[in-house]
Amino acid sequence: MKDFSDFFRNPHIWDREIVAVGGDLSPERLLYAYKNGIFPWSDQPILWYCLDPRSIFDLNKLHISKRLKRKINQKRYTITFNRAFEQVMRCCAYRPGEDTWITDLFIKSYTEFHKLGYAHSLEVWDENGKLGGGVYGIAIGNFFAGESMFSFIPDFGKIGLFHLFETLKKDHFTLFDTQQLNLVTLSLGAYQIPKKEYLKRLESAVASGKKWNPSHFVL
């Protein structure tokens, strides 16, 4: 892995959230960043963050309502992995009347990261084959960073997240990073931990460096 330690501040000792400004979104830089607890927001210029506190999910404690559980069990949908990565990103970026950090530069760069086996998507299709929801994120070793999700059909994003959790548990993932807490992730059970604890858990989770191949799961 290429060394970018001269570009990024060391998040173990740097006490500010922004650890670098500028650079590019090359696969090598993204891989180094995520393995060290750093992620990019915005692209004019690119700002690189390591937040304190950090928001994570416990993979065994996703909050699912009884109504949503019934909808999940009805199985009026199909789940796929990595079938429409760029489309999922564009759907996540589609927010009429709102700004989005998922710009064309991010879509192009993360699609390249996807082709290298580090970025992944989960798609939720309705009974007519329409893409109704999805999630995408980064997987390294036993670490997953959830980047964004969308629902064009009510609850399909949450259904996708449920199946993502189940799949990650089967593949022995140990850390699910949600970066920053918001109302949606909070309602689903996300919580915050100190950066120091997060970085310690991250180091263990990414240690193997293995790429994830979820295609063997049939949902």
Curated annotation (Swiss-Prot):
Functions in the N-end rule pathway of protein degradation where it conjugates Leu, Phe and, less efficiently, Met from aminoacyl-tRNAs to the N-termini of proteins containing an N-terminal arginine or lysine. It comes from Leptospira interrogans serogroup Icterohaemorrhagiae serovar Lai (strain 56601). One of its GO terms (cellular component) is cytoplasm. Its EC number is 2.3.2.6. One of its GO terms (molecular function) is leucyl-tRNA--protein transferase activity. It comes from the Bacteria. The keyword Acyltransferase applies. This is Leucyl/phenylalanyl-tRNA--protein transferase. Belongs to the L/F-transferase family. The gene is aat. GO terms for biological process: protein catabolic process. It is found in: Cytoplasm. It catalyses: N-terminal L-lysyl-[protein] + L-leucyl-tRNA(Leu) = N-terminal L-leucyl-L-lysyl-[protein] + tRNA(Leu) + H(+); N-terminal L-arginyl-[protein] + L-leucyl-tRNA(Leu) = N-terminal L-leucyl-L-arginyl-[protein] + tRNA(Leu) + H(+); L-phenylalanyl-tRNA(Phe) + an N-terminal L-alpha-aminoacyl-[protein] = an N-terminal L-phenylalanyl-L-alpha-aminoacyl-[protein] + tRNA(Phe). It is an enzyme of class 2 (transferase). Its main location: cytoplasm. The keyword Protease does not apply. Gene3D superfamilies: Leucyl/phenylalanyl-tRNA-protein transferase, C-terminal domain, Leucyl/phenylalanyl-tRNA-protein transferase, N-terminal domain. InterPro entries: Acyl_CoA_acyltransferase (IPR016181), Leu/Phe-tRNA_Trfase (IPR004616), Leu/Phe-tRNA_Trfase_C (IPR042203), Leu/Phe-tRNA_Trfase_N (IPR042221). Pfam families: Leu_Phe_trans.
